Structure formats: structure tokens, C-alpha cells
Amino acid sequence: MGSKFHAFMFPWFGFGHMTAFLHLANKLAEKDHKITFLLPKKARKQLESLNLFPDCIVFQTLTIPSVDGLPDGAETTSDIPISLGSFLASAMDRTRIQVKEAVSVGKPDLIFFDFAHWIPEIAREYGVKSVNFITISAACVAISFVPGRSQDDLGSTPPGYPSSKVLLRGHETNSLSFLSYPFGDGTSFYERIMIGLKNCDVISIRTCQEMEGKFCDFIENQFQRKVLLTGPMLPEPDNSKPLEDQWRQWLSKFDPGSVIYCALGSQIILEKDQFQELCLGMELTGLPFLVAVKPPKGSSTIQEALPKGFEERVKARGVVWGGWVQQPLILAHPSIGCFVSHCGFGSMWEALVNDCQIVFIPHLGEQILNTRLMSEELKVSVEVKREETGWFSKESLSGAVRSVMDRDSELGNWARRNHVKWKESLLRHGLMSGYLNKFVEALEKLVQNINLE
């Protein structure tokens, strides 16, 4: 291996982004590289336990400036509703002087970033290489962000796009309308991401050639930037904290592979009528289920929003829970037979490396594209059908679940076989370490080239 480097990391102030960056930091620190991790003060406490190499990874906190429209003390996406994201982006942009000072003093070799599109400018000023680390699927980047296209072109497939399946259809293109919204000071979300992709030295993506190679090649060709793959970087199971007794005891009442686990991510808050339809769809399956979702809009608790008579009807086999749960440990429990998910990027990988059948109810544009990748390219899952309005019915949900849970179902057996194949491929010995070794070697060469310039 080459000489050791010092990397700065500056992720977006959302915990999904920060934890993905920290997971990569741990992998680099494992190989004795030094990391300075820039983050809001509030986030430090929540992330410290995930820093596995405190001798190599140093947290450097930033003071998040006040911004009109941003609640006092808000520093991360968990402090605000999704509608206030633009104000948080403005706050991030206004840390630029602090970040520049940190780079000046710390003298890193590399800076990893995602939403802070001005990082490449600072990097060039100090002779540092910038790495745009993407924490969404390559397919999503390939269809959404292409040089020479405008925000108005998002409803059509870019020329040369390598898939006829991983697409948005009809009304689904509206799910990308947020890309044209203001996001930070004087820029839209689309412009912010495009500037970062065009100006960075290297693009890196948490994926693997086996799954998304053609999308990565398309991105590399479009941006004329080297695309480095970290591999899937699957999190190691945390065996230090067993599954909470409440869920261990409840799940143990049921036969192996019989329970549906449903979780729609931290961002999704359903309308009350759609929440009730979700509950009724679970009831309609006739199977035991655990649903972990936030209370719907307009409700302060799960209980007040449940359909009339629902709790009494399902009390022996169903739970709807509004709090946090240990998702990886629940998915690993032998009683779980089906995972119903929104198909966020993290949940997508979790689904692939577990044994349960997979059903997706995507909500956002990125999630829809992830779902098409999983259901139509890899053929490991089933997507719940929606109406033109975006509504999904209890019948479409229960039908999708039954189609994968029924042992006599051709669709279920087909998805099961493909899932086993992909799980074995992703978990085969040496795959992840091989990707990581190549990734680190490429970074070391990048740093060596700086020193030769």
C-alpha cells in the first residue's frame, strides 16, 4: 500500500449522510489513514459511538450560523421538517469561512463532500483533491444529473442512459420537482449537485460494479471524471446490543419466516387516510406484522390515528409502533419473512443481505428508482402498485405481500431465488475488502500525483 493520507470529510447535515461518511471514515482509518470529520456540534454526541477509530478519526465541530427561517438551535435535518431544508443548506453555506480556515490549518490531502458544492474551489486554492462522495444509487445520479441538460429535461430519459427499466413513469416525474426548488443561498438543489459533480476531481459512489456498473460507466463518461466505487460497504452487525426484550419476545411467538416487518424511513410521514390504508393492508394479509412508522400528519400519536376497531381485530398478531426500533436486528430475526420498505438507499442494502422477501412502497424519486433497480433489473423484490394520484390501496399492498410470501407463488419463488443469488454474491468472501483496497489505492495514487505536481 502507498503512503498514508489525511482526508477531511464534510457531509450534508443529515444523519443518513453523516453516518455513511463516518462508515467510510472507519474503513479508511482501519488502514491507518487520518480523518478530520467536520460536523455540527449537536451531531457530535450522536455520532461519537460510531467512531471506531478515535485515534485516527478526529471530530472537528462547526458553529452553525443563525439563518432567517431556520429555528433557533437547528443544526441537522432531524431538527427541522423537510420543508426547511433550504434554510439548513444556507446555514451550511455560511460555514464556508470556518471550513476554509480548517483546511488552511489542517492541510489535508483530500476533501470528501456531497452538498457543499463550493468545496472544490477551496480544495484547488490549497492544492487539495476533492472527492464527491455520493450516498444515493448510481442509477439515480445517472438519470437525474447529466451535463448539458436542464431541470426542464428531468421528465425524459437522457441520451445514452443505459436502462429501459430503471425509470420514472408518468406522474412519477413530479417526484423530482424538488430538484428545481431553491436549496441554500442563490442556488437550486439541481444546480448545487451539478456544480459539485462538474468541479470535483473524483466522483465516488457507495455501490458495486456487479449491481450498477453500467450506470457508473455512464456517469464517468458524462462528467469525464474518474468514478471510484467503495463497494457496498455493508455495516457489520452490532452484537454488543441484543434485540430489545419487547420485540424479541413478541417475534418469538410466531413461526420462522411468517412475520411482515414494515418501515418507511425517518422522512416519510403519511397522510392519515394513507396511513390507515397501510394498516388495513397489513391486516388483510392475514399474517402477523410489525409496522414501525411515524404518526401520520395531523396526529400526535399512532393510537389516535388507527382505523376504527383495528387494534381489537389484530391484537394477537399485529403491532403498529411509532418509536425507534433496532431495524438490522429485527430483520435478522428468524421470524421475519417479509420486509416492506420505502427503498431508501440504506434500507435497500439491508434488504439485500437479509433472508426475508422484499416488498417496496417508494415515495420519493430516488426511492422509486431504487425500487425499479431492485424489482426490474435485479428481480429480487416486488413493488406495490399505485394509482395515478400516488395512492396505494390495501388490496395492492396485501396482494404484493402475499405474492412473495406464498410458497406456491411463481413470482415469490422467482424473487426468492434471485435474492439468494445476490445475497451470496454481495457477501462472498473478499468482495467488500477487494473493493475497498482498490478504492484506497486509487486515493493514494491521487495524493501521490498532488505531491508530484
Swiss-Prot record:
Keywords, ordered alphabetically: Glycosyltransferase, Transferase
Top-rank EC class of the record's enzyme: transferase
Residues annotated as binding UDP-alpha-D-glucose: 266, 325-327, 342-350, 364-367
PROSITE patterns with a match to the protein in the record: UDPGT
EC number of the protein: 2.4.1.-
Family membership noted in the UniProt record: Belongs to the UDP-glycosyltransferase family.
SUPFAM superfamilies linked to this entry: UDP-Glycosyltransferase/glycogen phosphorylase
Protein name per Swiss-Prot or TrEMBL: UDP-glycosyltransferase 79B6
Disulfide bond residue pairs: none
Organism: Arabidopsis thaliana
Record gene name: UGT79B6
Annotated GO MF terms: UDP-glucosyltransferase activity
Signal peptide: none
